[in-house]
């Protein structure tokens, strides 16, 4: 019979081998460094996520890289709309407004509109899309049909094929990606990405000179994402 101490050692070795197998599997799928994988997996484990979730996400990124833009947008949008359950921050994080990194969202498998949008943005960047093509947009979303005057704060991701083009909207509420002209229920307030902020969300060109520092939650999110190994 194996002693309790012996059992602990066996289980410890088994757990270590599982972690090693997860690392190897992920590295075979992607081109990020071992150090970055370890950082991301550490965050995933800290929040109770399974390595298989991380592996599926990295597989999505690698499979999306050679695809055309429309297919890339569709696959990433569907992945998060399917994998993540909409839940308010207070239930997930015990805070009224917490912006989670993609790894934190994957670990919890739950999040609100900001978390969906942030995860899609970073995933598409990793899949080869440019910062110039994407903005996170704060909107007022109309609730209750075309005649309703009731709105609530919401966030979506917008893709621009060119600076002057009508954006396509990626939304956790509607899986179909639609042009902005078909989302009359959304009233843009302002837009931003890791390069800066546009006070007029429909404006093209150079973002506000004040930069991302105006959004303290976004600035904090970027720091945490960078610490986890994300590049932007």
Question: Which residues does each predicted region cover?
Answer:
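Mature extracytoplasmic/luminal segments of secretory-pathway proteins
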Residues: 8-11, 27, 110
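Bacterial N-terminal signal peptides that target proteins for export
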Residues: 4-21
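Short alpha-helical segments used as structural interaction elements across diverse proteins
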Residues: 15-16, 28, 117
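A structural boundary/capping signal
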Residues: 2-3, 31-232
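Bacterial N-terminal signal peptides
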Residues: 21-28
């Amino acid at each position: 019979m194996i002693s309790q101490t012996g059992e602990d050692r066996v289980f410890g070795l088994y757990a270590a081998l599982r972690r090693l197998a997860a690392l190897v599997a992920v590295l075979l799928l992607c081109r990020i460094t071992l150090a970055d994988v370890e950082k991301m997996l550490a965050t995933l484990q800290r929040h109770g996520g399974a390595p298989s979730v991380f592996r599926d996400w990295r597989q999505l990124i690698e499979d999306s890289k050679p695809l055309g833009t429309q297919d890339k947008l569709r696959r990433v949008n569907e992945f998060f709309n399917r994998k993540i359950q909409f839940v308010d921050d207070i239930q997930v994080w015990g805070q009224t407004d917490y912006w989670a990194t993609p790894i934190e969202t994957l670990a919890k498998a739950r999040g609100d509109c900001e978390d969906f949008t942030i995860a899609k943005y970073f995933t598409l960047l990793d899949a080869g899309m440019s910062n110039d093509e994407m903005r996170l947009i704060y909107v007022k979303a109309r609730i209750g049909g075309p005649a309703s005057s009731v709105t609530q704060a919401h966030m979506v991701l917008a893709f621009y094929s060119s600076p002057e083009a009508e954006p396509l909207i990626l939304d956790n509420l509607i899986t179909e990606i639609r042009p902005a002209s078909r989302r009359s229920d959304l009233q843009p307030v302002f837009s931003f990405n890791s390069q800066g902020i546009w006070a007029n969300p429909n404006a093209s060109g150079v973002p506000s000179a004040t930069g991302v520092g105006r959004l303290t939650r976004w600035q904090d999110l970027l720091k945490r994402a960078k610490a986890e190994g994300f590049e932007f």
